[in-house]
Amino acid sequence: MTGTFITVEGPDGAGKTTQLQLLADRLTAEGYEIVMTREPGGTRIGNEIRSLILNPDFQEMDEMTEILLYAASRAQHVNELIRPALAAGKIVLCDRFIDASIAYQGYGLGYTIEQVRSINQQATNHLTPDRTYLFDLTVSESKQRMMDRGALDRIEQRDDAFRQRVYDGFMTLAVQEPERIQLVDANQSIESLQTELCKDVLTYLKKRERLS
């Protein structure tokens, strides 16, 4: 049986990581085999690349270098962890994937969407998530949550205009792929959001099982 690849996306501070862990706990309790991971990172090599990308000391990093580092981390991640887990029939829950690169480096930095998408399709051999949950959080609320959290990484330090372009990019992707990308209101309480997320994921998994 082929596994299921589920990703979560959205602005920084939207609560994706917390919700993904709660979802993993619930699915494990339901008897599913879960692999929970994140980008950039997910592997030993990917985590080293992550430290380069996010380090605030590297403000001189060229934008194309940033794009390629994300893709390099993703290539390692897909081949070392994600594809083997899917081949074993597991559910992979991933905090960010290619949609993030399209939103942040495509819409955010102003590179063509086709260019960013092409680089990442080569890096992943065209792997696409089965289901993506896009956490909808305004730029102002995202910024406030990040400030409350403390020190900002190199990407989080970018200005509000960048954040707005990223947000608009995510919303555009949701319109373009409504079957795959499900919008989630990130302003809900943790409990309410978790109830909504778990309900949809379990419904989706049961549907896939019936069709398999």
Swiss-Prot record:
GO terms for molecular function: ATP binding; dTMP kinase activity. Its EC number is 2.7.4.9. InterPro entries: P-loop_NTPase (IPR027417), Thymidylate_kin-like_dom (IPR039430), Thymidylate_kinase (IPR018094). GO terms for cellular component: cytosol. ATP binds at G10, P11, D12, G13, A14, G15, K16, T17. It comes from the Bacteria. GO terms for biological process: dTDP biosynthetic process; dTTP biosynthetic process; dUDP biosynthetic process. CDD domains: TMPK. It is an enzyme of class 2 (transferase). The keyword DNA repair does not apply. It catalyses: dTMP + ATP = dTDP + ADP. Phosphorylation of dTMP to form dTDP in both de novo and salvage pathways of dTTP synthesis. This is Thymidylate kinase. It comes from Exiguobacterium sibiricum (strain DSM 17290 / CCUG 55495 / CIP 109462 / JCM 13490 / 255-15). The lineage of its organism: Bacteria, Bacillati, Bacillota, Bacilli, Bacillales. The gene is tmk.
